From Swiss-Prot:
Any Pfam family matching the protein: Aldolase_II
GO cellular component terms listed in the entry, alphabetical order: cytoplasm
Stated name of the protein: Methylthioribulose-1-phosphate dehydratase
Protein species of origin: Ajellomyces capsulatus (strain NAm1 / WU24)
Matches recorded under Gene3D superfamilies: Class II aldolase/adducin N-terminal domain (3.40.225.10)
Keyword Cytoplasm: yes
Zinc recorded as keyword: yes
GO molecular function, one term: zinc ion binding
Keywords tagged on the record: Amino-acid biosynthesis, Cytoplasm, Lyase, Metal-binding, Methionine biosynthesis, Zinc
Active-site residue numbers: 145 (proton donor/acceptor)
Binding sites annotated in the UniProt record for substrate: 99
């Protein structure tokens, strides 16, 4: 049994440290489930530590994930084809996350953690933006205190109360991995963004580390919910 474990590099996901990625990912997923962000096996999370990428599996109840369920990739690794990705630790009978190439796109930009949720508020704002601005519109909001929880850009500090937060929106596809090119195009068009919305689907949020990715995700979800409620009251998202 020990030889099998060594062969599968199980030691990579075994740690008593609560800050180890294999322990953080299950904890994050339980937290996200309580918010309704990863309902019905949706969503995911990934953490980069040194030259390893730790990823939650696909198609499982995220609130039940355990450390031994975590995949580990060698980084850097090719996004495509999936067979070229260098997994150095694979749980038996579980599928790698379909979000993997999108997570890798965030890590290629220097992220330390990337989160994908199916937040209902995120989905709703993508529909409202489409109706009000058309398919090319992005989500914008200003003069809300919680905006201060979002970075202005890499190394540029945080947004201020009077700044306008802009989050690009891309169209959904039948298969998760097919979102990668659109996500990367949005990253190029909005180089200071730390999130990309996916219409009728959810959002990808990344940060320099786990804490920043988590708090940015929370701040954005707060802003999306607020935006939906503001829309009901006929209040503009961007103050004139």
């Amino acid at each position: 049994m020990a030889a099998i474990k060594d062969e599968n590099n199980d030691h990579l996901v075994q740690s008593d440290n609560p800050e180890h990625p294999s322990n953080l990912i299950p904890a994050l997923c339980r937290n996200f489930y309580s918010h309704g962000w990863v309902t019905g096996t949706g969503g995911g999370a990934s953490i980069k530590r040194d030259n390893h990428i730790f990823i939650a599996p696909s198609g499982v109840q995220k609130e039940l994930i355990q450390p031994h369920d975590i995949f580990v990739l060698q980084y850097p690794t090719p996004k495509y084809p999936p067979s070229a990705r260098q997994y150095i630790r694979k749980p038996l009978e579980l599928k790698p996350s379909a979000c993997t190439p999108l997570f890798l796109a965030a890590f290629d930009r220097g992220a330390g953690c990337c989160i994908h949720t199916h937040s209902q508020w995120a989905v709703l704002v993508t529909l409202l933006v489409e109706r009000e601005k058309g398919p090319e519109g992005c989500f914008e909001i200003s003069n809300i205190e919680q905006i201060k929880g979002i970075p202005r850009g890499k190394g540029k500090g945080m947004l201020g109360f009077f700044d306008t937060l802009k989050i690009p929106i891309i169209e959904n596809t039948a298969f998760e991995e097919d979102l990668t090119s659109s996500l990367e195009e949005a990253m190029e068009k909005y180089p200071d963004t730390y999130a990309v919305l996916v219409r009728r689907h959810g959002i990808y949020v990344w940060g320099d580390d786990v804490a920043k990715a988590k708090t940015q995700c929370e701040s954005l979800d707060y802003l999306f919910q607020l935006a939906v409620e503001m829309h009901k009251l006929g209040l503009p998202w961007v103050k004139s």
